[in-house]
Amino acid sequence: MNPIVAAASVVSAGLAVGLAAIGPGMGQGTAAGYAVEGIARQPEAEGKIRGALLLSFAFMESLTIYGLVVALALLFANPFAS
């Protein structure tokens, strides 16, 4: 394998995981804050808010998992290496 391609793959894998975690991390923090605020305003809606929050957490976390899959593909099944 070309050393430049190997180095670029490692850097790209690191960036893929790092950048894929930034957005969902910020989104989860914002969503949790608004969920706590909503539960404080309407305690009787706690179950619905919590269910919607957990579902949205799953969708947000899937973006991070996709970044991890791309990083693993770049490291171990690199399509750019000959």
Curated annotation (Swiss-Prot):
- GO CC, one annotated term: proton-transporting ATP synthase complex
The source's domain of life comes to: Eukaryota
Q: Where is this site: Reversibly protonated during proton transport?
A: E61
Membrane-spanning residues: 3-23, 57-77
Q: How does it sit in the membrane?
A: Multi-pass membrane protein
Report the subcellular localization.
Plastid, Chloroplast thylakoid membrane
Q: Name one GO molecular function term.
A: lipid binding
Which family, according to the similarity comment?
A: Belongs to the ATPase C chain family.
Main role?
A: F(1)F(0) ATP synthase produces ATP from ADP in the presence of a proton or sodium gradient. F-type ATPases consist of two structural domains, F(1) containing the extramembraneous catalytic core and F(0) containing the membrane proton channel, linked together by a central stalk and a peripheral stalk. During catalysis, ATP synthesis in the catalytic domain of F(1) is coupled via a rotary mechanism of the central stalk subunits to proton translocation. Key component of the F(0) channel; it plays a direct role in translocation across the membrane. A homomeric c-ring of between 10-14 subunits forms the central stalk rotor element with the F(1) delta and epsilon subunits.
- Other remarks? In plastids the F-type ATPase is also known as CF(1)CF(0).
Subunit info here reads: F-type ATPases have 2 components, F(1) - the catalytic core - and F(0) - the membrane proton channel. F(1) has five subunits: alpha(3), beta(3), gamma(1), delta(1), epsilon(1). F(0) has four main subunits: a(1), b(1), b'(1) and c(10-14). The alpha and beta chains form an alternating ring which encloses part of the gamma chain. F(1) is attached to F(0) by a central stalk formed by the gamma and epsilon chains, while a peripheral stalk is formed by the delta, b and b' chains.
Q: What is this protein called?
A: ATP synthase subunit c, chloroplastic
- The organism named in the record is Tetradesmus obliquus (Green alga)
